Amino acid sequence: MHCDIYKFLKHDDMYIYIARPDYPNDTDEIKDWLGVLPKDFRAGLGRSKFVMHLDLATTPTLARVDKEEVLAKLASQGYFVQLPPQDVMRRQAELRARESQDSIYNT
C-alpha cells in the first residue's frame, strides 16, 4: 500500500496519511487527495503541506504509530490520522488556554 503524508500548519505534530492504492497508475491527472477526509474535519485543519510519499510494503516500522493500524485505516476509510503524543497535546492545550486568558485580561 502506498500513501502520501501531509501535515497542517495549524496542528503541530499531527500527520494525515492518505491511501494511494492505485499508485503509480494514478499520477496522470491532478487529484484532490485530501478529498477523502470528512468535510468538517478537513475545514478545521487549515492549509496542508505535503511531507512525503511512502510505500508501506517496504517500510518495516513507522515512528509513533503501529504500521498494521495505519494499513487497516487506509484500507477501510482511505486515511489515517496520526495525533501528537499526549504530552505534546497537553502542552498545546495549556498554551492555548494561557493565550486565551492573556487576551481577556490584557484588553
Curated annotation (Swiss-Prot):
Protein name: YcgL domain-containing protein Pcryo_0807
Alphabetical list of HAMAP family matching this protein: UPF0745
Source superkingdom: Bacteria
Lineage of producing organism: Bacteria, Pseudomonadati, Pseudomonadota, Gammaproteobacteria, Moraxellales
Domain (YcgL) ranges: 1-95
Gene3D superfamilies xref list: YcgL domain
Organism: Psychrobacter cryohalolentis (strain ATCC BAA-1226 / DSM 17306 / VKM B-2378 / K5)
